[in-house]
Design a protein with these regions (language model features):
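Peripheral, non-transmembrane regulatory/ligand-interaction domains of membrane transport proteins
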Residues: 1-104
Length: 104
């Protein structure tokens, strides 16, 4: 699933949008292959960057694609999981992709 958001800079109100435009935030959670393809075609990036960002085994890193001016940040975010009734502290990667003026 993915949703796009746009913020009106005059009112500072963020709303969901269906239009691909400069400055949008694109939030992707477990997107289908078709959704990944659609987003990549509309904003002009490689599918690999989104797939890296969605990989639960990715390590924290920064990757720069100079051909299309895209930057991928993978950060490890702390989470608490319950295993056998006990709290276990772990990390989960979150991917942030900067594409010119779009963020995924």
């Amino acid at each position: 699933m993915f949703k796009m958001y746009s913020t009106d800079l005059q009112t500072n109100i963020t709303e969901e949008t269906k239009e691909y435009k400069k400055g949008n935030w694109i939030n992707m959670v477990s997107p289908s292959d078709e959704e990944i393809k659609t987003v990549c075609e509309n904003i002009g990036i490689q599918e690999d960057f989104i797939r890296y960002a969605l990989d639960s085994e990715e390590k924290a890193r920064i990757d720069i694609e100079e051909d299309d001016n895209t930057i991928l940040f993978i950060i490890d975010t702390p989470i608490i999981e319950i295993e056998s009734g006990a709290k276990v502290y772990s990390t989960m990667p979150i991917g942030i992709i900067f594409v010119r003026d779009d963020y995924i």
